[in-house]
Amino acid sequence: MRPGTSITPLSLTRRLGLFFALVLSIALASMGAFAYYSLAAQLEARDDEVVKGKLEQVEHFLREVDGVQGVPAAQHRFDDLVRGYSDLIVRVTALDGRLLFRTGNDALLEGTDQAAVTGKSSLMFQSADAVLGRDGTRATVFVAKSGEDRKQVTARFRTTLVLGTTVGVILTALVGAAITRRELEPAHVLIKQINRISVERLSYRVDMPPKPTEVRDIASAFNAMLQRLEDGYQKLSRFSADLAHDLRTPLNNLIGHAEVALSRDRTGPEYVALVEESLVEYQRLARMIDAMLFLARADSANVALELTELQLNAELRKLSAYFSVLAEERSVVIRVSGDATLVADAILFQRAINNVLSNAVRHAWPNSMIDLVVRREAAHCCIDITNVGDPIPERELSLIFDRFFRGDRARSNSSQSTGLGLAIVLSIMELHGGDASAVSGLDGKTRFTLRFPLNGAEASARVSVGRPSQDRPVVG
């Protein structure tokens, strides 16, 4: 193989076909070997039984003859004994070595003596001493059967076995590949459909094949992934559009201030006023950039939580005191009730409560009340922040935690909001393993609920027990 070249891996169809062939070849080879050796053993046992039976018959004949002289007269009886057995050899030898009788296929023993014959592995033989007639003369009987027929049968069986195994393996490989190709056809169709998907066609969904179940599950999971991608892409598109819109307003204001300043000579107080107006826009941009950086770190799980035990009643009273001046200006009263111990990041906890509470104060009706209630719910510690004001439309409740989302009321005073406060709240809750929700009724009561897990935040967070909370809430 030349340097730089790579071996193309076999397709799943070919690999399964080869796998089927390998498994079948091992199975057939094992069964064939068992059948072959079983047949050989049975043939040997049959030949051994034949030799043993003929030996007993010869011994019986010899006992009936009249001594050594009577053996030739019984030639016809010995010939009948081996008739039909062309591979059978019978020898009767006197104790002095004289050959008294032999019959059968002498060619099998030609050029050999009895000792040599007994060493031939292809012959089945037995020998025994026999008594000739009533005079008590003894002789040696040797009966052997050639193994050529047995070898031919086993050879034919072996050839048939090898040929059948080879053909079976080849057919199995071909049939297995064909079946695999047919069963994987939905996968090829799925691949073609996936190749049609592009950024402009994220709404496209692949077909759900009725079978096989595995491909159907893949198609279902792929469609679910496409749905998530489409949702994420749409959110990213909205985020980009909203970001451009929200950055354009302060930048246009700054450009306008600069153009006004350069249009003619200004007095000192006029320049101070222009700089103060520009500073407001700079601060708004800074808040927006800070919020976006926090959300980016939260999305990438790049925020390490400093966990500490918090007494929620004390923390909420501290936050309500911070907003007391703004609440008094709007004739709003903030009440805190309930208490619990919570393990959370103190600064992020304050930031989440601050963002919700600032919205509650800003949108509360004059002479109304804001309730901060701590309660337990199963394995969660819940903080309810309820105010009375204009109800939030149902269609906006599902979008209220989205980035850059601002309702109609907020957009009437856009300089006071970046549209990222509640998105930051949701990110903080998710970092702690909790969630945030909002409900609004026609009676004007709007309740935001923050659910913190009682067992602390993510296990990967760094724990710092006893870390003091900040006296001043973190805004934004």
UniProtKB/Swiss-Prot annotation:
Pfam families linked: CusS, HAMP, HATPase_c, HisKA
Membrane-topology annotation of the record: Single-pass membrane protein
Keywords: ATP-binding, Cadmium, Cell inner membrane, Cell membrane, Cobalt, Kinase, Membrane, Nucleotide-binding, Phosphoprotein, Plasmid, Signal, Transferase, Transmembrane, Transmembrane helix, Two-component regulatory system, Zinc
Compartments, record wording: Cell inner membrane
HAMP domain residues: 181-234
EC category name: transferase
Enzyme Commission number: 2.7.13.3
Catalysed reaction equations from the record: ATP + protein L-histidine = ADP + protein N-phospho-L-histidine
Keyword Lipid biosynthesis recorded: no
GO cellular component: plasma membrane
Periplasmic topological domain: 37-158
Domain Histidine kinase: residue ranges: 242-455
One Gene Ontology term of the molecular function aspect: phosphorelay sensor kinase activity
Ranges of the Cytoplasmic topological domain: 180-476
InterPro entries, per the entry: CusS-like_sensor, CztS_silS_copS, HAMP_dom, HATPase_C_sf, His_kinase_dom, HisK_dim/P_dom, HisK_dim/P_sf, Sig_transdc_His_kin-like_C
Principal localisation: membrane
Disulfide pattern: none
Stimuli inducing this protein: By cadmium, lead, and zinc.
Residues annotated with Phosphohistidine modification: H245
Signal sequence residues: 1-35
Transmembrane segments: 159-179
NCBIfam families: cztS_silS_copS
Biological role stated in the UniProt entry: Member of the two-component regulatory system CzcS/CzcR involved in the control of cobalt, zinc and cadmium homeostasis. Probably activates CzcR by phosphorylation.
Protein name: Sensor protein CzcS
